[in-house]
Amino acid sequence: MPITPASLSFAEDGTPYSTAYGDVYHSSDGGLGQAHHVFLAGNGLPERWRGRERFVIVETGFGLGLNFLASWAAWRKDPQRSERLHFVSCELHPFRVEDLALLHARWPEFAPLAAELQANWPCLAPGVHRLHLDGGRVCLTLYFGDARDGLAQLDARADAFLLDGFSPAKNPDLWSARIFHLLARLAAADATLATWSVAGEVREGLRRAGFEVEKAPGFGGKRQMLRGRYLGRGHRPAPAAAERRALVIGAGVAGTSIAERLAARGWQVELLDAASGPAQGASGNHAGVLRPLPSLDDNRMGRLTRAGTLYGWRHIQRLQAAGLPLRAEACGVLHLARDAAQEAKMRAVVERLALPPAHLRFVSAAEASEIGGWPVPLGGWWFGDSGWVQPPSLCAANLSAGGEGIRAHWNARVTLARADTRWQARDAQGALLAEAPVAILAAGTGITGFPLAAPLPVVSARGQVSLLPAPAGSAPRVVMCRMGYVSPAVDGLRCAGATFDVGDDDATLRARDHHENLSKLEAMLPGYTAALATQPAEGRVGFRPASPDRLPMVGAVPALTTLAAPCALAEIPRHTGLYALSGFGARGLVWATLAAETLASQLDGEPLPLERDLVDALDPARFLLRPARTLRGED
């Protein structure tokens, strides 16, 4: 469902007000006082987060973000705070960032925190958005959409609940029995809750869901509030790993991404690769594309590529802000239609999804020609916040960001076996190189060389790109896609491609594949190849690990290759401590960073950065539940 932003309005006394719901965003006696008295003190904070590794707060309505800012500020002020703070919140009508800035200016004491939040504020697209703040110590996970859907899709273990939103009379859906039972599903064993509402139906609904509630003195002109705790068994937080060490096999975008994400959480990572350095396989191309693939029904591919693109660019911006020499530019991506029928479908997709125009809009042939700097016969999609990334520089930046948390082993062609409670990586002579309780297979097509990965239907797809001489500033000035893609000039070269041949193991550059790439380029930009001064003599061949459904494989590796009887995905036996990060196909840049964040969150017992149905769609064991589909030899 498209996201409709909140409109900025104020009540007569100046309190932020929603015309859609006819209610104020916080108490007219003061939003900050309400946040401290009702939501923080009502949940026993800051005392309850002291001494913990992490503390997870789940909120039903983000609104202005005032409860989040108050929680973040209180956490920063407390010298005995938890190591990490997770704040998870739903919002059906999020504010535009410029409106948030105006609202946050009312609380100058939060100015530095508010500025950081605003600088990281995500695109107003439906789904989950994860923001890393305060040097990664504070994690804000936002679900833009209906809270009934969001709470059902979230995977988290909440220590405290903030029940905030417009009044039950104005917004009954947010105070329904379904909401309360969804909160109970997320509750940790010692979870507490607090809310300003003492309505009878709220008290009774919470009791029926398993919460014990009591009235307490309210804030300002409101005489009473509610606080409570969960009486059910709840979900015990995943215990911290006794030894936070992992083996990561493979140092392409997948392996370096998970290594960086684990190192950011304090893990020690042993990174092993058969090559002499990072990005020597499919991740070694001169330039690749980071952009989504929308669909009319907003299917899983569409949602995952959107989430991966948005999170991927936020990750790139964090690395660049840290001063790392990562080569990437969100110059925009044009995806042109093949024919008039597809052009009409692309227009319909844009109209149906109604995403922010800065993220996706339809452009005519005339506008596409102007944007790209070359005349084209048809229009298509314009992704204004997407662009190109140089994969080797991303891999290098990930390793630099991981610092001493990552120890690399090059020229390490290894075998993997479990010994007692650890996975051991040994070289060809049997010498032990590294061992850890957790092992992650991120070796691209090399994953097929590990017998334990036999349940994973990874196939190799050969891809050849062509490198064309390109003066700086020459057309096209943005990334352009149709049946293939072409990048703008990057260090004097333009990357065009790519072929996609399943089961082809020829590692040599082929003239016929250069011709195929040029044919795709000519079909996209009529007359362009005739203007080339020279035909491509340079290029690169890579072998991409692809899956039958074109979605990556992220999670625990199944311990069997077939099922004797039907069962649920969660019931499939897994190898203890063995995980896969593979099947990225031609979209390694799109998948890698978000997939790594998802797996790292699973390993650390944190709230997940994706909806549950999307996490299941990535589970490596999913292929045991259905017949494998044939992977077509096209991209």
UniProtKB/Swiss-Prot annotation:
Ribosomal protein among keywords: no
E.C. code: 2.1.1.61, 1.5.-.-
Cofactor: FAD
Keywords: Cytoplasm, FAD, Flavoprotein, Methyltransferase, Multifunctional enzyme, Oxidoreductase, S-adenosyl-L-methionine, Transferase, tRNA processing
GO biological process, one term: methylation
Catalytic activity: 5-aminomethyl-2-thiouridine(34) in tRNA + S-adenosyl-L-methionine = 5-methylaminomethyl-2-thiouridine(34) in tRNA + S-adenosyl-L-homocysteine + H(+)
Region (tRNA (mnm(5)s(2)U34)-methyltransferase): 1-231
Chain residue ranges for the region called FAD-dependent cmnm(5)s(2)U34 oxidoreductase: 249-635
GO molecular function: flavin adenine dinucleotide binding; oxidoreductase activity, acting on the CH-NH group of donors; tRNA (5-methylaminomethyl-2-thiouridylate)(34)-methyltransferase activity
Compartments, as annotated in UniProt: Cytoplasm
Cellular compartments per GO CC: cytoplasm
Key word tRNA processing present: yes
Pfam families named among the record's database cross-references: DAO, Methyltransf_30
Transmembrane feature ranges: none
UniProt record similarity statement: In the N-terminal section; belongs to the methyltransferase superfamily. tRNA (mnm(5)s(2)U34)-methyltransferase family. In the C-terminal section; belongs to the DAO family.
Described function: Catalyzes the last two steps in the biosynthesis of 5-methylaminomethyl-2-thiouridine (mnm(5)s(2)U) at the wobble position (U34) in tRNA. Catalyzes the FAD-dependent demodification of cmnm(5)s(2)U34 to nm(5)s(2)U34, followed by the transfer of a methyl group from S-adenosyl-L-methionine to nm(5)s(2)U34, to form mnm(5)s(2)U34.
UniProt name for this protein: tRNA 5-methylaminomethyl-2-thiouridine biosynthesis bifunctional protein MnmC
The organism of origin for this protein: Azoarcus sp. (strain BH72)
Designated gene of the protein: mnmC
